[in-house]
Amino acid sequence: MENIILELEKSLFKYEFMSDIEYLNKIIDDKYVEVGKSGRKFLKNEVIKDLSILKQDRKISIYNFTCDKIGEEIYLIHYITKSNEDNIYRTSIWKKENGKIKIIFHQASLYKEKVNLIEY
C-alpha cells in the first residue's frame, strides 16, 4: 500500500493528472480538507479548481516518505518537500473504501528542523 499511496501523492504534482478533473474527483474524498502552508483551509472543490488550472508539472520532489497504517484501511503519510530554500513538512491521510483509495486530509507546514533528505 505504501508504494501505491506514494505514487498517488506524486500524481498530484504532475500536470497529466492535475489537469484531469475526473481523476481528481476519483482520488480526492468528498469530505477532503487541506490546510496549506499559508494557514488557509481548502475544501475539495477549491483544490480541484486550483490544480486543474495549472499548465505544467509542479517542480516538487518527495523526501523522507513514511506510511503508517493507523486504522482499518486508513493510512497516515508524512513527507518533506522543498519550496525554494524552505522545507515543507506534509501530512496526508488516505483511506481505502470499497476498493478505492482516496485522500481525505492534507496539511503543509513550514519545517525549520535540520534534516537529512532522502528522495523517494
Residue ranges and their predicted role:
Residues 2-18, 31-120:
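A beta-strand edge to alpha-helix "cap/lid" segment located at domain peripheries
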